[in-house]
Regions:
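GHKL (Bergerat-fold) ATPase N-terminal catalytic module, capturing the glycine-rich phosphate-binding loop
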Residues: 1-142, 146-147, 162, 180, ...
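GHKL/Bergerat-fold ATPase module in large chromosome/replication-associated machines
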Residues: 80, 98-121, 141-145, 151-276
Length: 276
């Protein structure tokens, strides 16, 4: 999902694609314990039928590598993850069946539905997806049903995806997503505004008439897309470093000291060395 969105961003920068109005890159992870499924939805570059045939049904063909080779004079491999064309097949370690629904960004592209129960056999036909991006559904095997549990899924995502360059949102099917309440001064176009109506005074009681108050809610992202080490050291305070240390290493103590690395020559290096 991250690679798919990164590719679309690079195409937009190169002038080969225009984001639709209000576009917000994100990955949705939806657990469904009733149906024993785990779903991943991105609004990235998507795939055509030919691309599904090449990158999904054939092992060791990397879409990221092919993309970088095609645009090697126009872009770099920054933020690209996949290189070997093998990662997708790890899905069959936890799933009896995998389904893909995808729609390419290319003009005139048709949606594609792909399904496989492992092995060498698969089904591919025209799908019904209407938005650009890819949706992958894992039908979990009996040994992996724990991943349909919202809390277990959150634990795994926080461990391995906390600093992905794209916002990742986790939700449970047919349940209310997790929200943060946002100050009205910090409202974004993508936030949800809820009008809250206070109760009227009961008959015979004194009180103010009912009022409307706006409550602004924003979905809670699992990933921190701008972690502390990517910032300039001059922008970071002592409390920032301590809070980040406690969050990442789950240590209530303060580190003895730290070194913020921010090098551009002779090579690019960013990071924070903590000494507990």
């Amino acid at each position: 999902g991250c690679d798919a969105i990164t590719k679309l961003k690079k195409l937009e920068v190169m002038g080969e694609y225009t984001f639709p109005e209000g576009y917000k890159p994100e990955i949705q992870v939806i657990v469904n314990p009733d149906e024993k499924t785990l779903k991943f939805i991105d609004n990235g570059i998507g795939m055509t039928a030919d691309e599904v045939e090449k990158y999904i049904t054939q092992i060791a063909f990397s879409g990221a590598t092919q993309f970088l080779e095609k645009y090697k004079d126009k872009t770099t491999e920054d933020d690209m993850i996949g290189h070997f064309g093998l990662g997708f097949y790890s899905a069959f370690m936890v799933a009896d069946e995998v389904q893909i629904d995808t729609l390419s960004y290319k003009e005139g592209a048709k949606p594609v539905h792909w399904a496989s129960e492992g092995g060498t056999e698969y089904e591919m036909q025209e799908g019904n997806k209407t938005t650009v991006g890819t949706e992958i559904t894992l039908y979990l095997n009996e040994d992996s049903l724990e991943f349909a549990n919202e809390y277990r899924a959150r634990e795994v995502l926080e461990r391995y995806c906390s600093f992905m360059p794209v916002e990742i949102f986790l939700s449970k099917a047919n349940a209310e997503p997790e929200y943060d309440t946002i100050d009205e001064d910090d409202v974004l176009d993508t936030d949800t505004v809820v009008e809250h109506i206070t109760e009227e005074p009961k008959e015979g009681e004194e009180g103010e008439p009912k009022k409307k108050a706006k409550i602004v809610r924003r979905p809670v992202s699992i990933s921190d897309t701008h972690p502390l080490w990517t910032k300039n050291p001059s922008e970071c305070t002592k409390d920032d470093y301590i809070d980040f240390y406690r969050k990442v290493f789950m240590d209530y103590k303060e580190p003895l000291f730290w070194i913020h690395l921010n090098m551009d020559y002779p090579f690019n290096l960013k990071g924070i060395l903590y000494f507990p």
